[in-house]
Amino acid sequence: MLAKRIVPCLDVKDGKVVKGVQFRNHEIVGDIVPLAARYAQEGADELVFYDISASAKGAIVDKSWVSRIAERIDIPFCVAGGIKTAEQAREILAFGADKISINSPALSDPSLIRRLHDEFGRQCVVVGIDSFYDAGSGNYTVKQFTGDEAATKDTRWHTLDWVEEVQRQGCGEIVLNVMNQDGVRQGYDIEQLLKVRAICDVPLIASGGAGTMAHFAEVFTDARVDAALAASVFHKGIINIGELKQFLVSQGIAIRLTE
């Protein structure tokens, strides 16, 4: 059995790490490189960095901090933010990133996934999906440009349909960002994750809702995800990654422990 992964997420805006609740009201929580180094030291399996305002502004992630992170940490990391071409992806990988992630640009041009797949290989291409649950209709739908509340918009995609499409295009991994759960620390959306898991043949990362160590155990056991992503519980020191991993081992979950 492959070990489950713990993945801290660092949302970056104007050169600082920020965190919001349900993708709104972002506050500064720290500097990029020191936080990245701290999480690597605590035992994170990999890191994800989202330049959350890049796509909404028509910009691309600031590559200067990518190289600084690569110099400081020795675990894999993934970078997202306005990547629209293979050339832009190549530059970010050259600066030291191990994977690139696309979200809004893929919604604008789904064939971008295939082009990145053909250029760099499936294992390098992650697709982030910002999924919103509409209680009125009971539908899960995909939002675009969520890094800027004023720019966020609906798309024509239902979440499960988009999950199937990004796999058809060749993505190597999916991060399901559950917008309703983001930052509220009430647990992952197991019901939605199970629906996605049933049609997802690539590694699936759960994002949105972690508040306790038990929430991580629950999402691994009940939703059968490959990795759990979280932000505020790590940024605010609510959960230590090393202690979390020890807890998960005690629950019988396969996890990589650091020495």
Curated annotation (Swiss-Prot):
Keywords: Amino-acid biosynthesis, Cytoplasm, Histidine biosynthesis, Lyase. Its main location: cytoplasm. CDD domains: HisF. Its EC number is 4.3.2.10. Heterodimer of HisH and HisF. Belongs to the HisA/HisF family. IGPS catalyzes the conversion of PRFAR and glutamine to IGP, AICAR and glutamate. The HisF subunit catalyzes the cyclization activity that produces IGP and AICAR from PRFAR using the ammonia provided by the HisH subunit. This is Imidazole glycerol phosphate synthase subunit HisF. It comes from Shewanella amazonensis (strain ATCC BAA-1098 / SB2B).
